Amino acid sequence: MASFQIPVINLEVREVKDIVWEKIQEPVNQRRLILVIVSIALLLDNMLYMVIVPIIPDYLREIGSFDDGPTPPPLRDNITGKIIPVHHDHHGQDSATGILFASKAIVQLMVNPFSGGLIDKIGYDLPMMIGLTIMFFSTAVFACGSSYSVLFFARSLQGAGSAFADTAGLAMIADRFTEENERSQALGIALAFISFGCLVAPPFGGALYQFAGKEVPFLILALVCLLDGLMLLLVMKPVKEAMKQSKDVQDQVIPIWRLLMDPYIAVCAGALTMSNVALAFLEPTISLWMEDNMTTDNWKIGMVWLPAFFPHVLGVVITVKMARKYPQHQWLMAAGGLALEGFSCFIIPFCSGYKMLMLPICVICFGIALIDTALLPTLGYLVDVRYVSVYGSIYAIADISYSIAYAVGPIIAGGVVEAIGFTALNFLIAFSNLAYVPVLRKLRNIYDFKPFENEANILMQDPPNKEYQTYVMHDQKPVEGGVKNHLEYGQQYQQEQETNLDDQQYEYQQQQQGYQQGYQQDQGYQPGYQEQGGSYAPQGQPRVANPFQQQQQQQQQQQQQVQSRGPAAPANPFRQGF
């Protein structure tokens, strides 16, 4: 049976498949594809987290999980006729919504220590596939769930999937992008997708929930998760082969508790936790605060987060460019971002308009971008310099830092809002962020251990950069053809001179031989004549001894003695000097 031939390119499907598979297996394309897969996985995970912000409070009230009780009639001022707003008693809805939000982070916090160690042992591809599979099922359960208990189970299941997918994704980027600037840029792109998921998901979920129902946004995200898993199948085999080649490094795994005891890593982890405290406390509470003070439209409540995407991406770009020029000042960028978050939390409770509220939220997201983009590459750098370049446990610590904020934040936020109000909650967030800023000063000296500027970590299977030309160490000739080892070069050049000193000595001998010939012509015997029988006959004179000729004769005798002993050893092209 003849295979189908594609009309335009005149190639069979099998040939096209082989060409595409060969291109995918190239190291450069592998890294690009891995970055795309990890970015989609992080986008999906954060969209699943944030898409429920405008949906869950209204949906739980709709299915009757909470009862607001009898609504009192609106009060009117007898003089002006102005309607006085009535305080809504949510009957524990703040706390219950916060627990539902925090269930994902609590499970993720418990699974992360095990997922990080497992990733260090077996590689990155299989744990990431496990995470995507769990996230797919949790999203499907979210779409079909119609009670608080089912939604709680789906939310917790998503936390287990995130513990594998997020940690494996960040570790995979750090492992494949070993050069510091490339790693910062790749992690910056991944953080841009994280921000896109966090900030676009609320308007995405709110609009689809209001106009199409609760099931539609979750079914779309489940489809994206399935497609990302299929893309991961394309890189699983090559990545697994690479892990087998570096098995000797995998055996030197550093325990996660030992990394946590490192003071520099602990400071970075604390900063990542504090950077996410603001969003973790505000996300489950600001929607109810907006319903009481601004608007009850679900799409508007979700849309308040959308403009913050642009300053977040701007913060990522600025931090990547600044880190490339001033890597020793990344701690200062993180400190500035944390201070911006604290000042913005002071402003939020005093915002009286919908558009005014967008401004401090944008500044908060800009500060988060500064912190995350500066500290995530710093964690990989600390492991490279102080430990072994295995990244599962270190990025499990980063994921634990996020999980602590999102596990504790929603639960405490709901209780604080019910006890002392939304304004006091924002003040507590602001003071905690500003208090942690001086702690980041401990990171100011970590780049004293920075390698030489021209020294770079490369992957052995990557092709050489076209900016460089490889030369043989011996005679400075470009390497022709394929790559050879030192034994092959030794066989190729064994007939040539062994060292640069031999070349100089050989030139010296040639020069002295020419000098000797000139000496004989100039200083040699000019024939004298004696009259013998009416004719002149030449009469010889004794030749003056030439020290250079004697030296040459001695050297020739020594060479003959060496040749009589046997063949010389092969020349070593890497030996220099004597």
Curated annotation (Swiss-Prot):
Q: What is the protein's name according to its record? A: Vesicular acetylcholine transporter
Question: Which intervals carry biased composition (Low complexity)?
Answer: 507-534, 549-563
Q: Name one GO molecular function term.
A: xenobiotic transmembrane transporter activity
* Ranges facing Lumenal, vesicle side: 54-98, 147-154, 209-215, 285-299, 352-355, 409-413
Gene Ontology cellular-component annotations: AP-1 adaptor complex; AP-2 adaptor complex; terminal bouton
Q: What is its main location?
A: membrane
Subcellular localization(s) per the UniProt record: Membrane
Q: Which InterPro entries match?
A: MFS, MFS_dom, MFS_trans_sf, MFS_Vesicular_Transporter, Multidrug-R
Q: Which family would the database say this protein is a member of?
A: Belongs to the major facilitator superfamily. Vesicular transporter family.
Q: Which SUPFAM superfamilies match?
A: MFS general substrate transporter
Tell me which parts of the chain lie in the Cytoplasmic compartment.
1-32, 120-125, 176-187, 237-263, 321-330, 377-387, 435-578
Recorded source organism is Drosophila melanogaster
Glycosylation (residues): N78, N293
Q: Name one Pfam family in it.
A: MFS_1
* Signal sequence, start to end: none
Please provide the Gene Ontology terms (biological process) for this protein. Answer: chemical synaptic transmission
Which keywords does the record carry?
Glycoprotein, Membrane, Neurotransmitter transport, Transmembrane, Transmembrane helix, Transport
Chain segments carrying region Disordered: 507-578
Membrane-crossing ranges are 33-53, 99-119, 126-146, 155-175, 188-208, 216-236, 264-284, 300-320, 331-351, 356-376, 388-408, 414-434
The record's CDD domains line, in alphabetical order, gives: MFS_SLC18A3_VAChT (cd17383)
